[in-house]
Amino acid sequence: MDATVILPILKKKLAFLSGGKDRRSGLILTIPLCSDQTSMDELSVTLDYLLSIPSDKCKARGFTVIVDGRKSQWNVVKTVVLMLQNVVPAEVSLVCVVKPDEFWDKKVTHFCFWKEKDRLGFEVILVSGNKLTRYIEPNQLTEEFGGSLTYDHMDWLNKRLVFEKFTKESTSLLDELAVINNGSDKGSQNEKERSVDFNYLPSVDPETVLQTGHELLSELQQRRFNGSDGGVSWSPMDDELLAQPQVMKLLDSLREQYTRYQEVCRQRSKRTQLDEIQQKVMQVVNWLEGPGSEQLRTQWGIGDSIRASQALQQKHEEIESQHSEWFAVYVELNQQIAALLNAGDEEDLVELKTLQQRLSDVCYRQASQLEFRQNLLQTALDFHSVAQDLSQQLDGLLGMLCVDVAPTDGAAIQQTLKLLEEKLKSVDTGLQGLREKGQGLLDQITNQASWAYGKDVSTENKDNVDHIQGIMEDMQLRKQRCEDMVDVRRLKMLQMVQLFKCEEDAAQAVDWLNELLDALLKTHIRLGDDSQETKILLEKHRKFVDVAQSTYDYGRQLLQATVVLCQSLRCTSRSSGDTLPKLNRVWKQFTITSEERVHRLEMALAFHSNAEKILQECPDLGETVMDFEQFDEVEAVGKSVLDRLTVPVIYPDGTEQYFGTPSDMASTAEHIRERIKMVCLKKQQLLEPDESIRES
């Protein structure tokens, strides 16, 4: 019988076990009769419930029943005592009927319970409330009987309800846990072969029941302090009353079963987790080896241009994006498997490691294929980028070579040649880079066969190889054509440089001849003070003329070279109508001037030679006539020289030039005149002795 069923009756406190004990350690059962009408049925139910609480060992020590009749009638008391005979005759050892003062002494003295002892089965005594201590210790009596034992019926009832609830829940929970645990032991092998669908859970939370039991046990074990007199008394919830050992036993059983249950749950959770992991692993593996591999199996091209390679890269990025989702699942699964491996369940290690190894192998193989494909496409894009740059460079170089240049001078030609060489060097570097990129791409394509999954990729690879080699060969041919054109352009420009150089040097020769002519007119003025000096001047003049002749010949050769170069270059020399006439004109002027200079020096030499001969000799008298003729001749030559100094040099174009300045001519003429005077004076000296002889 549960307290909850008869809770309204129990709340009436028709009887109670206070927790007190008699001198034989038997429990004290108190029946507080009231003046109100007491229901014997309810009292019987209450007694049945209370007497079901103590253990058999406790019952064997017997009960002492206190029937408090101080507020009741004798008939009721008598009925209760007789009822005890029917309810608990074996357990009752003594019944203490607390009588009212001076009431029953007169009315019922004729009734002696002791006479009924054999029939009742227990001893009944009438005692006053203040005389109970003769039979029971004061600390085992409640306050209404003058004792110090504290009893709170509602507190006891509440704890009793808790106890019964705990007992009921724990017993039910133990049965449920036993079913779960035993079922798990029997079906453990089968559960490994099928998905776990046994999710049976206890009807109550084991943690809550355990907590309730611990709290109840704590209440049962604690002591209470009586605040009124400072004495210590046992709680009415004594272990003999509420079966503290029973609570402890239930708790121990619960802990044991709950521990097994937790292990079962852990094993089932682990099994479920393993099955889920295996399912997810197979999902990842099946997708990577199925649709994922098929996506890569269809992607073998490298594109034939930058745009095509970029489109393939974009397609590959979409494939990578799809793979990334599965790789994320792989990372999560790998972490879960690692956590389970760290848990160290030996029976699952082999299975977990097998799953992990297979998952890792598939994912790493697929990731390697993706990376290889990405690297291949990037290399192809780099190759096409280099090819496009090289093609643009070749187009630019070819365009530059196809345009006929007309440089104005050698510096411009040198600059153009330098630019051509730089472009050709850049093209050569670009072609070398293209070869390196192409060879790297060819190597990668060769290795691509290892990812073929059995597919024949020879056709795709051959197309890719032919495309790469075709681009490299085409670029090589275009470069070779450009090199040939550069060689032709270089030769032409070098000839143009030579042409410009010849023209410049020819113009320089004209300038030099002008300078020589100018020097001849302005500085080659003196005719010498004597024959020796005149000879020296004449010799210097011949050398001077040789220099001018060499300059003129050099200019003529340069102009002839320009004619040849112009014929080779199929162009018109800028010097053909300008420099050559200038050269011829200045050379003609120089020749005329030089001849005039030579003529004057020769006349001066003849004058000085004859004059010196006359002035240095002392002829005999027989030669006088001839000497006079020489004098006249010398004088005539001297005058001719003087006359010649005043004559300008007349050129074919009608222009005239004088040697030196008028002062220079005057100085030269003055010296000639001095010589003429000396000759005349010599002549006079010769004439005077002759006249003296005649006179004598």
From Swiss-Prot:
Swiss-Prot/TrEMBL GO biological process terms: blood vessel morphogenesis
Spectrin repeats: 272-378, 381-494, 500-602
InterPro entries: CRAL-TRIO_dom, CRAL-TRIO_dom_sf, Spectrin_SESTD1
Protein keywords: Repeat
Domain CRAL-TRIO: from-to ranges: 1-153
Pfam families for the chain: CRAL_TRIO_2, Spectrin_SESTD1
Keyword Repeat on entry: yes
SUPFAM superfamilies (UniProt xref): CRAL/TRIO domain, Spectrin repeat
Family affiliation: Belongs to the SOLO family.
Database matches in PANTHER family: SEC14 DOMAIN AND SPECTRIN REPEAT-CONTAINING PROTEIN 1 (PTHR46607:SF1)
Function: May act as the primary docking protein directing membrane turnover and assembly of the transient receptor potential channels trpc4 and trpc5. Binds phospholipids.
Protein name listed in UniProt: SEC14 domain and spectrin repeat-containing protein 1
Protein source organism: Xenopus tropicalis (Western clawed frog)
Name of encoding gene: sestd1
